């Protein structure tokens, strides 16, 4: 019987990126932190739901802090040293996510608010009656 042919596989080389972009999407229900390179290719991401928080605890500043820390530690493997932070959304985890990325050890070059603001676009949802 013939021996099975062994395939030679090359180890995937991780590219080294020195500066990246951290996209923080802070909604009222969740916070998503994505770290990309300058071209927009994702290096790592984390959400407050994926960090183990469920329900109303997902929308807390502490959950955003944990998610940003998780995404930041994963991006350290690529050699990222400095970050530009782009914040989108009105959620409660905006500032704590940026503070957490700073505590991980990144040099934050600038912080940009890219929240989309309509110039009288779509009709907003009806007001809540509690």
UniProtKB/Swiss-Prot annotation:
Q: Gene Ontology cellular component?
A: ribonucleoprotein complex; ribosome
> Which GO biological-process labels does this protein carry?
translation
Arranged from A to Z, the UniProt key words for this protein are:
Ribonucleoprotein, Ribosomal protein, RNA-binding, rRNA-binding
According to the UniProt entry, its GO molecular function terms are: rRNA binding; structural constituent of ribosome
Q: The organism sits in which domain of life?
A: Bacteria
**InterPro entries linked:** Ribosomal_uS11 (IPR001971), Ribosomal_uS11_bac-type (IPR019981), Ribosomal_uS11_CS (IPR018102), Ribosomal_uS11_sf (IPR036967)
Described function: Located on the platform of the 30S subunit, it bridges several disparate RNA helices of the 16S rRNA. Forms part of the Shine-Dalgarno cleft in the 70S ribosome.
- Entry similarity comment: Belongs to the universal ribosomal protein uS11 family.
Quaternary state and interactors: Part of the 30S ribosomal subunit. Interacts with proteins S7 and S18. Binds to IF-3.
The identity of this protein, by name, is Small ribosomal subunit protein uS11
State the gene name recorded for this protein: rpsK
